[in-house]
Amino acid sequence: MQYSMRHLPVRWLVATALLLGLLAGCQSTPPSPSKENQAAIDRMLVLVDERLEVAPQVARSKWNSGADIEAPEREAAILDRVTGRSAEAGVDESFARDFFQAQFEASKEVQRRLHQRWLKEGRGPFDNPPDLAEEVRPVLDRLTPALIVSLGELQSLVKVPGVGSYLEARATELVTGDFDGDPRRIALEPLKDR
């Protein structure tokens, strides 16, 4: 069978289209985590969201009292405590330290942004600001052990194919009220970097 030169471009285009179709079919999307792993990830994201929801209360209290957002000595003491408790629960110490440091940084980012907004608005003191010792710390004290348990569940999952993409997708749904997503990104960075 003879082909004229004018048929070659058509055959080439057809062959190229078939090859591209085959290659596109070979691209694999990351597998979805199991339902059990999805539930573990969702639990962590809900806890991170609950912790970030405390940040505006802290910001209001510090706005009224004039206290600094940064409290390095207090943070260091808390970080040492939660890292030790995490290690006792079988969580890798550096993973726990990085994770809880990220929670502090995300919370401070929310506080800084609120203080900037209030300063720009010329905001005066809040009526009945939350008491950090009586109202806020008990919430954090309740969340911390749950975060440690969840961190223990996730430390082996974060390396499983498909977990990272699931985590990112669900985070935008479950971690809300954090301005433009920066506090969420900061809070979850240690889970993505493993």
What are these model-derived regions, one by one?
Residues 119-156:
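Extended amphipathic alpha-helical interaction segments
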Residues 40-43, 54, 74-78, 82, ...:
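Stable alpha-helical elements in mature extracytoplasmic
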Residues 59-89:
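N-terminal, post-signal-peptide region of Sec/Tat-exported proteins
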Residues 23-25:
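C-terminal motif of bacterial Sec signal peptides marking the signal peptidase cleavage site
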Residues 32-70:
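Immediate post-signal-peptide N-terminus of mature secreted/exported proteins
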Residues 151-194:
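Glycine-rich, aromatic-bearing surface loops/beta-hairpins
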Residues 2-14:
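Bacterial N-terminal signal peptides that target proteins for export
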Residues 88-126:
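Mid-length scaffold segments of soluble, non-membrane domains
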